[in-house]
Amino acid sequence: MFNYKKFLADVSHEPGVYRMYDDKDQVIYVGKAKDLKKRLSSYFRKNLSSKKTEALVASIHHIDTMLTSSETEALLLEHNFIKLYQPRYNVLLRDDKSYPFILLTKERHPRITSYRGSKKFAGEYFGPYPHAGAVRETLSLLQKLFPVRQCENSVYSNRSRPCLQYQIGRCSAPCVQGYVSDEEYNQQVELARLFLQGKDQLVLDYLIGKMEQASRNLDFEQAARYRDQIQAVRSVIEKQFVSNERLDDMDIMSIAYQHGLACVQVMFIRQGKVLGNRSYFPKVPANTDLSELTETFVGQFYLQGHQGRSIPNSIIVDRQLAEKSELEQLLTDQAGRKVTIQESVKGDKSKYLQLAQVNAKAALNVQLKQSSRMSERYQALCDLLNLPEIKRMECFDISHTMGNQTVASCVVFNQEGPLKSDYRRFNIEGITGGDDYAAMEQALQKRYERDLEEDKIPDIIFIDGGKGQLNRALNVFQHLQVKWDKNRPHLIGVAKGVDRRAGQEVLIISKQEREIHLPDDSLALHLIQHIRDESHNHAISGHRKKRQKAFTQSGLETIEGVGAKRRQALLKYLGGLQGVKKATLDEIASVPGISLKLAETIFETLKND
C-alpha cells in the first residue's frame, strides 16, 4: 500500500508536474499544480470529490514529481506528458493528425495547392481546414472562380501546350508563353488571395471596376468574361453565412456527453469565414467533470506538438474553466500574440456556439448508435467462435500490380472499432512477383517476430485468403521464436467463396479445423467484412502510393553522388526529366555542381534505363 504520509513529507510547495504510477509501473495519471504539496495532499483527504478520484487513489503505487519555474511551464509539461504516457485516468485526445492548409506559393506564376505539415515552403498559408474534404471543396471552388494554376511544378515546367484545365476555363495557362501576361495572371492570384482572406466585397468591387473599364473601351468580350466571374463570385457569397460583425480568427468548441461517451465539436473560423467543423471523441475516464474535460481538451488540442494546428486569436467554449488565465497565458506564449478564451458570448458568436452545440449532440447520437452496433457485432463474433471476449483483432491483405510494388497491410480493431493509430504497412521485397503466399509470410514475420506487450497480442488474426494463405500463416507461427504467447491468437482465413462476391465469404477456423458459411444478415459476418475491407483499402492505398512514387521518380534518385540539390539543378538547367534524358554528356557536365566524372555516371545510367 502506498505510504502517502511519508511521500508528502518530502514534497515542496513549488509549482510542478506529478506522475502517478500503478503496481505495474505504468503511468495512470499526470497532473500539474501551482503548489505541489497542497495539490497532492488533496488526493488523500477523507472525503474525495468524485468516484473517479477514489478509483485513481486506490490504484496508486508510487508518485514522482518534477519542479518547474512557473505554473505556465507546468501546464505545458503536463500536456506533453499526457501525450507521451497516455494515462488511463486522464482525458485523452485520440487525434494525432496534422491539419491541411491551402498554400499560395511564392513564384513567378504562383500556384494554389493543399498542404499538410510544417510551413517550410515560401508562400501564404490559409487555414487550418478541419479535414482534407474541406480543402478539396475550396480548391475546386477557387478553380471555378479564378483561373490560377493548381498543377505541380514538374507538370508546369514541362508543358508545350495548355492542358485540359485551360480548355475548360479553369486555368489561364501561364505555363505556355502567349496565353496570359504576368500582370493578368497576378491579378487573378490577388483576387484568389483576397477571397481566401474573406475580403469578398473587395473582390467584387475590383471585378466590377474592370468590367466597366472594358465596356468603356468597347472590349465587350472581356467585359462579358468579367460579368460571368462577378456572377460566379456573387453566387458563392450568397450561399455563405453573412455576419453583421467582423469576426476574428476563432475556434468555437462545444461538448456533449452521454452514456460515458463525449463529443467535442470544433468549428473553425478564419478571416471571417467558416472553414468547417469537426467532431472529436476523446477518451474520458468515468465521472470526469465536463469543465475539466474542456480544459484538458483545449490544452491537448493546441499544445501537444501542435499537429499543424494554428492557434486562433480567440477560443470560445461553453464551460467555465478553473484555470482559464493560466491556459490563456500559455497559448499566448506559444502563439506569440494575445490569445483569449471566451466563456460567454453574444451576437453572431452566440449563434455559432449554439450551432456547435447542436452539431455536438447530433454527432454524439450517431457515435452512440455506431458503438451499439459495434458491440452487438463483437458479441455475435464471440458467440460464433465460442470465445468469452475479443479485445483485439488484426487483419492482413496483399496488394500489387502484376507482381510489382507489393505492399502488405495490417489493420487493427478493438472493441470500439478501427484502431487506426496501430495500422501498419509492409514493403514486400525479395520474392517472386505475384507470389501472394510469400508476401503474406514476409508480412507476418515482420509483424510478429518481435516482442509484443500483453495488450498488443491479438485475440484473432484474419488472413484475407483461402486454405493456402492460412496454412502459410500457421507455418510462420509454428516457427516463431518469441517470448509472448504465440498460441493465443486464433488464425482465421477469409475466403471469398465460389463466386467471389460479398456475402458469400467462407471462414476457415484453424484451431477448430472447420469451415463456416455465414448468412448475409449475420452480425459476425458484417464485422469480418468491415475489418477485411479496411485491410483491403489500406493495402491498396499503400500500393498506389508506392506505384506513384516509382512512376514519378526521375531515375536520378538511385545514382550515387546525386542528392536533392544536384537533382534539382539538373532538372532546372536541362528543362525537366525529359531534358536530362535527352542531354549530351557535355550538357550534363555544364550544370553547376556536376563534375565530368559524375556527368559520365549520370549519362551512362540514364542511357541504360
From Swiss-Prot:
**Span of domain UVR:** 201-236
Q: Where is the GIY-YIG domain?
A: 13-91
Q: Which UniProt keywords apply?
A: Cytoplasm, DNA damage, DNA excision, DNA repair, Excision nuclease, SOS response
Q: Does the keyword Flavoprotein apply?
A: no
Please list the GO terms describing molecular function. Answer: DNA binding; excinuclease ABC activity
Q: Which GO CC annotations does the UniProt entry carry?
A: cytoplasm; excinuclease repair complex
**Gene Ontology terms: biological process:** nucleotide-excision repair; SOS response
- One Pfam family of this chain: HHH_5
Chief subcellular location: cytoplasm
As for subcellular location, the record says:
Cytoplasm
Which NCBIfam families does the record associate with it?
A: PRK00558.1-5, uvrC
This protein's assembly is summarised as: Interacts with UvrB in an incision complex.
Q: Which HAMAP family match?
A: UvrC
Protein's job: The UvrABC repair system catalyzes the recognition and processing of DNA lesions. UvrC both incises the 5' and 3' sides of the lesion. The N-terminal half is responsible for the 3' incision and the C-terminal half is responsible for the 5' incision.
The UniProt family comment states: Belongs to the UvrC family.
State the name under which the record lists this protein: UvrABC system protein C
Native species of this protein?
Haemophilus influenzae (strain PittEE)
